[in-house]
Amino acid sequence: MRITNVHHLPLAIVEAVKNDPYPHGQTGDISATSLIAPPQLVALRRQHEADLEEDAADRIWSLLGQSIHTILERAEPSAITERRLFAHCAGWRISGQADRIVPLDLEYETIHIEDYKTTSVWSVIDGVKPEWADQLHVLQWLAAENGYDVRGLSIVALLRDWSRNKAKDGGNYPQAPV
């Protein structure tokens, strides 16, 4: 995929977008995210990867989401951050990256998996997105295949457009930005 700079963003931002550390193409036969996506979309992306373009401005929220993952590495030293797990199923090597694996015992055998999302309030106002839950369940399966006893799953949504005034109105509007 080619990253463009239609909006003339500062070079540092464009280069940060281009240098995404996510290991595209090095994750196995299929990643958890691709596994839950529509098959035609995955096939077309793979077939036309070299022809695809995306503007750096359209990747800003993704870039900021990556910064959250870096910050999380400073939290709770016993937790494992950004761990890629692999397992085989029906001849496929499936992979998924857990944002945080929190050990519930000293042997790191019993765990809780946390997935962090930097998103809009409107993405959570009616509940968890089905694809987020699906991704967590793939991670749960991968963890179990790697010998972990998964006792809990959490999606932690960081709401970039949260408003204290709207929260005061009540209803199903989130009462905090996390």
Model-derived regions: residue spans:
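Metal-dependent nuclease catalytic regions and adjoining charged, substrate-binding loops involved
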Residues: 1-8, 141-178
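Short acidic/polar capping segments at secondary-structure boundaries
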Residues: 118-121, 160-162
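A short secondary-structure junction signal
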Residues: 115, 124-126, 164-169
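Metal-dependent nuclease catalytic cores that hydrolyze phosphodiester bonds in DNA/RNA
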Residues: 1-113, 120-133
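A structural signal for short, well-ordered beta-strand segments and their strand-loop junctions
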Residues: 80, 112-115, 150-157
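An active-site-proximal "capping" alpha-helix that borders the catalytic cofactor pocket
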Residues: 132-144
